Amino acid sequence: MSYTLPELGYAYNALEPHFDAQTMEIHHSKHHQAYVNNANAALEGLPAELVEMYPGHLISNLDKIPAEKRGALRNNAGGHTNHSLFWKSLKKGTTLQGALKDAIERDFGSVDAFKAEFEKAAATRFGSGWAWLVLTAEGKLAVVSTANQDNPLMGKEVAGCEGFPLLGLDVWEHAYYLKFQNRRPDYIKEFWNVVNWDFVAERFEQKTAHSNCAK
């Protein structure tokens, strides 16, 4: 299977004034495309069982990848997986509600407390990386962060955390520097205006419906 750049499903300016069109275009058509190209190059010559895996499945099985290819696929299949989720997680005008809101209030105490923890994880991630809302194996919600293009699906030994990612925020400078320069906290605050809570809730509900550990 050859990876391809996913369509956004919306115009590059659809998230204005919160996320600017120029950044969105460069981020999607240049940065994400580079991860796709580099991942495809790294897949060449690998056994079919690895090549045919979906990216999220592949990065969950990094130990099965030959050592000489592992780093390239950790970075680039990771980048492809992360960005593919990121684009789907963005939309103006949705509302956090229903079972997901209830679970956030249960596990963080309040929506504001969740947002504060998420913002801290995103703001304090040194260098490049991601902040995540994940569903743990115990059926609880948690906030974690990863370096570079690591993903919680990679597991604790690789990424330093684990869980099923429901929502991720890219805090690489390429995600915000044209508009926000060094003001990462401002970018993080604007993120709440463009979270596609409908998508995140659907992801949460599908995962809990098929999980024996769901509470």
Swiss-Prot record:
Binds 1 Mn(2+) ion per subunit. Transmembrane segments: none annotated. One of its GO terms (molecular function) is metal ion binding. GO terms for cellular component: cytoplasm. Its EC number is 1.15.1.1. It holds the Pfam family Sod_Fe_C. PROSITE patterns: SOD_MN. Keywords: Manganese, Metal-binding, Oxidoreductase. Its cofactor is Mn(2+). Mn(2+) binds at H27, H83, D170, H174. InterPro entries: Mn/Fe_SOD, Mn/Fe_SOD_BS, Mn/Fe_SOD_C, Mn/Fe_SOD_N, Mn/Fe_SOD_N_sf, SOD_C_sf. GO terms for biological process: removal of superoxide radicals. It comes from the Bacteria. It catalyses: 2 superoxide + 2 H(+) = H2O2 + O2. Belongs to the iron/manganese superoxide dismutase family. Homodimer. Destroys superoxide anion radicals which are normally produced within the cells and which are toxic to biological systems. This is Superoxide dismutase [Mn]. It comes from Haemophilus influenzae (strain ATCC 51907 / DSM 11121 / KW20 / Rd). The gene is sodA.
